[in-house]
């Protein structure tokens, strides 16, 4: 009887240990996709960011390149139209010169009129709005890629929280401009620590001030990683420029993906891991006999 009680007690202890172990397994389950309410240890690596971004770019190359090309055409159209209207509305005065050798030449002086000044001002506003729209659109698509959601070309033209993005962008430009007037360095520092503000506005619908605060906290949590990520993004864009600007169709999407990866990792969020090729099926072939 005592032996039976002993085995029953031993079985009870084993069941309790297994139940506790199962509980530990549940506790160790990874959190659902998204992001926590506070920053965690990110385990960020710029090498992983570059590898992940390139992997995701190769899987969505056309979907990423076409929107960048379309935005580039739109930017060129706004710049060209503004410049053409400014020149057309300005006053031009032609002066002829003849040197001592009898060679004649002309110079054209262009004086901007009030109408031309208004057109230039409106052109700057349109260009600024288009850049923010492009930034928000590309971030929206890249964030969906980071979440593992299917994306299309149209995804990059449907930015989320556009109103918050516009106000956040205006806030960043205003503070950076004021910092630049006081001294160049404060403006540059603020621009650097506020680099994730638009991503917060797009991804988490935070207010402009909260987006800037969250970006400063995120950069402060890993300054070294933020600097390396920024340098990697800059390198991707510069390499694209060196390739006769055609490479920017690749460099800009890769830089945007690095930016999103860094933002998610440093802010305690998650990204869908890169898909690696599966190993070959079956045993490898053995040595061939002659």
Where are the regions that the model predicts?
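Selective recognition of hydrophobic, aromatic-rich stretches within alpha-helical transmembrane segments
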Residues: 34-37, 113-149, 173-210, 237, ...
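Intrinsically disordered, low-complexity Pro/Gly-rich regions
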Residues: 19-20, 24-42, 272-290
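Short, small/hydrophobic-residue-rich motifs at membrane-helix boundaries and re-entrant hairpins
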Residues: 34-143, 169
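Alpha-helical transmembrane segments and their immediate juxtamembrane interface regions
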Residues: 101-110, 200-228, 257-284
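Single conserved hydrophobic/aromatic residue that forms the stacking wall/gate
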Residues: 1-26
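Interfacial aromatic "cap" segments that immediately flank transmembrane helices
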Residues: 43, 47-74, 150-179, 193-241
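Alpha-helix initiation/capping motif
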Residues: 6, 11, 15, 39-42, ...
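Hydrophobic aliphatic residue packing
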Residues: 13, 25-26, 73, 146, ...
């Amino acid at each position: 009887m005592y032996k039976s009680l002993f085995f029953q007690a031993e079985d009870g202890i084993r069941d309790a240990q297994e139940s506790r172990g199962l509980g530990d397994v549940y506790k160790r389950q990874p959190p659902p996709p998204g992001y926590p309410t506070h920053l965690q240890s990110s385990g960020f690596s710029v090498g992983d960011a570059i590898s992940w971004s390139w992997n995701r770019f190769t899987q969505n190359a056309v979907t990423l390149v076409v929107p960048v090309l379309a935005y580039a055409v739109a930017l060129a159209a706004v710049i060209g139209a503004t410049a053409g209207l400014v020149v057309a509305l300005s006053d031009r005065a032609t002066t002829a010169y003849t040197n001592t050798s009898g060679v004649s030449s002309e110079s054209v002086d262009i004086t901007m009129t009030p109408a031309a000044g208004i057109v230039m001002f409106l052109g700057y506003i349109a260009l600024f709005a288009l850049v923010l729209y492009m930034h928000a659109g590309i971030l929206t698509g890249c964030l969906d890629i980071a979440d593992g959601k299917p994306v299309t070309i149209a995804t990059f033209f449907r930015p989320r929280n556009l109103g918050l993005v516009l106000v956040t962008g205006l806030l960043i430009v205003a503070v950076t401009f004021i910092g630049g007037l006081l001294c160049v360095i404060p403006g540059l520092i603020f621009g650097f620590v506020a680099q994730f503000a638009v991503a917060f506005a797009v991804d988490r619908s935070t207010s402009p001030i909260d987006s800037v605060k969250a970006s400063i906290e995120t950069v402060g949590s890993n300054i070294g990683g933020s600097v390396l990520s920024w340098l990697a993004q800059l390198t991707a864009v510069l390499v694209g420029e060196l390739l006769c600007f055609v490479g920017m169709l690749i460099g800009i999407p890769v830089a945007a993906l690095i930016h999103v990866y860094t933002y998610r990792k440093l802010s305690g969020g998650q990204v869908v891991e890169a898909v690696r090729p599966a190993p070959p099926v079956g045993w490898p072939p053995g040595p061939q006999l002659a």
